[in-house]
Amino acid sequence: MMIAGAEANVEPLVRQSSKPEFGDYQANGAMAAAKKLAMNPREFAQKILDNLDVSDMVDKLEIAGPGFINIFLKPSWLAKQANFALQAVNFGIKTAQPQTILIDYSSPNVAKEMHVGHLRSTIIGDAVVRTLEFLGNNVIRANHVGDWGTQFGMLIAYLEKMENEQASEMQLSDLEAFYRAAKESYDSDQIFAEKARNYVVKLQSGDEYCRTMWKKLVDITMHHNQENYDRLNVTLTEKDVMGESLYNPMLPEIVADLKAKGLAVEDNGAVVVFLDEFKNKDGDPMGVIIQKSDGGFLYTTTDIAAAKYRYETLKVDRALVFSDSRQAQHMQQAWLITRKAGYVPASFSLEHPFFGMMLGKDGKPFKTRSGGTVKLKDLLDEAVERADKLISARSTNLTVAEKSAVVEAVAIGSVKYSDLSKNRTTDYVFDWDNMLTFEGNTAPYMQYAYTRIRSIFARAEIDPDTLTGEMQLTEEKERTLALKLLQFEEALTAVAKEGMPHILCQYLYELAGIFSSFYEACPMLNADEAIKHSRLRLASLTAKTLKQGLDLLGIKTVEKM
């Protein structure tokens, strides 16, 4: 476009075409560029084509409508690129400018068992982490656990009261019972409550006994959480913990600095930042409290410190916080204060890829039948029970070990894929019947699509790595499949940019459908040798892409189902 006279900053706006008659891609940027140059858009589009030589990759370029450029790619070029993708490391995909990116996700509370409310942040965040890493970025995982606050005073005091300092021997379920009992004692026993408050002060001032007990509580919790992460095939480990306690020493200095800069003022004993960008119900600037009148700090203060630390100390280019949509205003306010204070530059990207709620089929927040919170472990156990029934009804030729692996892969995969395949910004209805089925856009369907392709090679006793020759795209179904395979990178780039794994799910589902059409229309094993090898290479690249795509979602594949 620059050759035709467009400014350097004008985007060509190349998009996948919505219909085959419009080509494989459309370039829509000519109209905006022509407007800036006061030219006729179609004439400007023609000027672009007159100065463009892409004959090695393009069959045809045509101008449509007010100035769209339709691009039809050559089958020979598609075949060459697909051949390269099959042989190259990571399909030949790499990021031109890798970044250091921090992903804040999962973030359960210490001394409590993980529940379904932690599921979305954990699996959506992890899918984005995996994708960003695959694209060549340096990714820092940050598990922003709730490991600070008055609850630790209660827990330490109650453990002492029960003469049980062997916290490391306790199961987390005991800790939950301890938490409830400690809260009851705190509410009903003034002497106990005073001791708990004293322990909070001691903990914050570095008292060795309190710090030791606190560390035990954190370690027990994270060990238990790790079991959930491992079972979910999530890449978080205990070394990724960056809890609230990490930022606690920074908070007094931040409050003092915000006051010194005139951003924060004292108001009825509390320290408040008034933001003109947010109005209260009376139309006045909204006050955001960063320190309570009793001296305590708030989540906003911690999030300001976290943003500052991530830029100054970790030196990241982007920081993404995966939490639910109810946190949107809170994050906006914390980051607005962060920027007003000059703690991060405009170039530092602070992003809140929020998600909706997890609902039951009744449209209400997902609960147990008795109305309680569903523990994550219990949810995964039920998934395994249901997946066992699904697989038992279909598969009879699996060994006990094979069946166990299939059941676990389908169970966990179904829970994850059902969520990941939905646009994260919407509320998500959890429905066992819709996720544990081989019909439609589900994990079992996707896992079977992969296994089905692998079985072609197994039955024919062909090692896909031994296939030779170049790909030939003589049939339309072959061409369509090759084009879709080469759009894998585009799907991953969109996930990385938008933090939306459902884009990858939709791509994989469409790929599986296109392969199915190809499989029905284009015989493989009975074709001429050159065609046979070409089609088997396409099948091999499809299997490789499905496996890699599912792996980026944190979903396991199996060789037999």
UniProtKB/Swiss-Prot annotation:
Which GO cellular component term is one of those annotated? cytoplasm
Specify whether Isomerase is a keyword of the entry: no
User: Which is an annotated GO molecular function term of this record?
Assistant: ATP binding
Q: Where is this motif: 'HIGH' region?
A: 108-118
Q: Name one GO biological process term.
A: arginyl-tRNA aminoacylation
Instruction: Give a yes or no for keyword Transferase in this entry.
Output: no
Taxonomically, what lineage is the organism? Bacteria, Pseudomonadati, Pseudomonadota, Gammaproteobacteria, Pasteurellales
Membrane-spanning ranges: none
Source organism (scientific name): Haemophilus ducreyi (strain 35000HP / ATCC 700724)
- Name of the protein in question: Arginine--tRNA ligase
Query: What catalytic activity does the UniProt entry give for this protein?
Result: tRNA(Arg) + L-arginine + ATP = L-arginyl-tRNA(Arg) + AMP + diphosphate
Q: Which family does it belong to?
A: Belongs to the class-I aminoacyl-tRNA synthetase family.
Q: Which UniProt keywords apply?
A: Aminoacyl-tRNA synthetase, ATP-binding, Cytoplasm, Ligase, Nucleotide-binding, Protein biosynthesis
**Cross-referenced Pfam families, in alphabetical order?**
Arg_tRNA_synt_N (PF03485), DALR_1 (PF05746), tRNA-synt_1d (PF00750)
Task: Kindly give the NCBIfam families that the UniProt entry links to this protein.
Answer: argS
The EC code for this enzyme is 6.1.1.19
Q: Which residues form a coiled coil?
A: none
Give the source's domain of life in one word.
Bacteria
